[in-house]
């Protein structure tokens, strides 16, 4: 799914939604968190005919996200995979094809403040018809 048919491009949120919809229609045990994650990763890659991604293995393309789950909101969570669908939304560290692009919650590849200012200017111009 993407911005053409949805209001966000968040793979984790889509996996969670798929799991919840299965549970509403087919019962609480209809889809586990692990099944939802596999559907979102391996399943998505398989649908696209991409054997080079969708899994963490030698030779596969990979983007790796790391969340800090040491906070009180994650305390007592017994299923660590469930944290992916219900845990923190802000990534601590992010690697895209081996290159770190977020470190300790901060984007490392561009100046976020400048990007926000530019976006605000462009949005204002668009709304003003300039």
Name each model-derived stretch.
Residues 8, 33, 37, 108, ...:
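Generic structural signal for well-ordered, non-membrane alpha-helical segments
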Residues 1-70, 85-87:
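His/Asp/Glu-enriched, well-ordered alpha-helical/loop segment
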């Amino acid at each position: 799914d993407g911005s053409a048919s949805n209001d966000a491009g968040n793979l984790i949120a889509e996996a969670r939604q798929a799991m919840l919809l299965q549970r509403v229609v087919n019962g609480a045990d209809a889809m586990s968190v692990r099944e939802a994650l596999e559907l979102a990763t391996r399943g998505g890659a398989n649908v696209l005919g991409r054997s080079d991604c969708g899994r963490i293995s030698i030779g596969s393309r990979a983007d790796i996200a790391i969340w800090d789950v040491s906070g009180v909101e994650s305390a007592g969570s017994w299923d660590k995979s469930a944290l992916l669908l219900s845990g923190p939304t802000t990534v601590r560290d992010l690697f895209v094809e081996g290159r770190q692009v977020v470190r300790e919650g901060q984007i490392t590849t561009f100046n976020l403040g400048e990007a926000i200012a530019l976006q605000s200017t462009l949005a204002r111009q668009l709304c003003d018809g300039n």
